[in-house]
């Protein structure tokens, strides 16, 4: 890890610099240097977990279930914009993950950036591949071309046996 720089505060960790894994929307807006995961999670004061949406008819973001679709979805920035448009003003409270991420999230993202947004499943995939160690990355690589329902794969027999704790690996970053 690089040494801290005096007078600077770390607000996030770069997890992706491959331009092919940055969305067309972000590229068009000039956000091409890389993707950053905030070092704080966006959640309420009562829980370290955040619900995606309380709206039972939520359909603003397409539901993707194959490994191909998961890996290919790098549209977190666009999905966040779609949610903000579909749930304007106080209605955003129906989607806590998006509300906490886009409403007064601290630390603020620097000016000239896309700002914070909820990552898509493909962007979470990239984070896990980078931060959870080589075995997780190797396993995820095998699923990039998995064309069946990946949730079924894990629910009914697909397993991942690791020689280490991936959450500990993620938390060590």
Feature annotation, model-predicted:
Residues 37, 118-119:
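Short hydrophobic beta-strand that contains or immediately precedes a catalytic carboxylate
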Residues 1-113:
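Short, compositionally biased
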Residues 90, 94, 98-115, 121-173:
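An exposed tryptophan-centered "aromatic clamp" motif
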């Amino acid at each position: 890890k690089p040494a801290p720089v005096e007078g600077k505060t770390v607000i996030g960790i770069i997890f992706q610099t491959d331009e092919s894994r940055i969305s067309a929307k972000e590229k068009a807006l000039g956000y091409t240097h890389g993707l950053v995961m905030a070092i704080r999670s966006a959640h309420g004061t009562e829980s370290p977990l955040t619900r995606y949406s309380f709206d039972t008819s939520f359909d603003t973001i397409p539901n993707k279930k194959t490994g191909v679709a998961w890996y290919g979805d790098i549209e977190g920035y666009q999905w966040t914009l779609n949610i903000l448009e579909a749930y304007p003003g106080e209605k955003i409270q129906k989607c806590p993950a998006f509300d906490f991420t886009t409403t007064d999230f601290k630390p603020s993202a620097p000016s000239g950036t896309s700002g914070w947004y909820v990552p898509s499943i493909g962007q979470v995939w990239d984070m896990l591949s980078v931060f959870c160690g080589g075995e997780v990355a190797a396993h995820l690589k095998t699923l990039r071309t998995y064309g069946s329902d990946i949730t079924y794969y894990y629910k009914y027999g697909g397993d991942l046996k690791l020689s280490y704790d991936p959450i500990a690996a993620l938390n060590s970053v």
